[in-house]
Amino acid sequence: MACLFHWTSYLLRWYIGGRIPLGNGHETMLFLAGFLLLCTCIWQRRFSFLLPAGLLLSGFTLLVAYLSEMNPQITPLMPVLLSPWLSLHVSLIMVSYALFALMCLCSILALSIRRHAWQRQRLTLFCRVLLYPAVLCLGIGIFIGAVWANVSWGSYWAWDPKEVWALITFMLYGCLLYTSPSPR
């Protein structure tokens, strides 16, 4: 029910604003929380621990969105931010970050389980399964962000902190992907 309510309000924000609501930090955090809720709803039947964990992660994301200095108002964007490349770039990056957050939570749970080895193995396998789409979305998101930056600013890469840390994250998780055995 929370997922349905959240996505309904997100779609209303899209309708009222007349644009995809990914143009500022507040809207990006709303998308991240919504995707975490969606993942939780999809996988909670198979992994019962995911319901409280996903709701907690989504709730913290919404808390950050509403208690921070980010502007929650629906405002018109600068023309450079109205590009469909930007919406695709931001949504892919946020999807990857949501999957990484779920992986982190599952890894912490797997490390805390002492008695049941089968649960630990199941959590580890779930993390490995999440790793593939997370790295793929992050890589494609970085590439599309570079294309958007070139179209908008005239340069593919500017070495600002967001770009650098996204690249570092991609490289670290890419190494993990390269060294981990494939899921069966």
Which residue ranges define each predicted feature?
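Hydrophobic cores of alpha-helical transmembrane segments in multi-pass inner/ER membrane proteins
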Residues: L32-W43, I93-L109, A166-L177
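A loop-to-helix transmembrane entry motif
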Residues: G23, V129-L136, W157-L167
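Small-polar-interrupted transmembrane alpha-helices in polytopic inner-membrane proteins
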Residues: A2-Y10, L130-A149
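Conserved small/polar residues in nucleotide/adenosyl-binding loops
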Residues: Y178-P183
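Core alpha-helical transmembrane segments of integral membrane proteins
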Residues: M1-G59, V64, S68, P72-T75
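Interfacial and helix-entry/exit segments of alpha-helical transmembrane bundles
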Residues: A53-S58, A117-I140, R184
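Membrane-interface interhelical loops and short amphipathic "cap" helices
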Residues: T8-T28, M70-S91, G145-P161
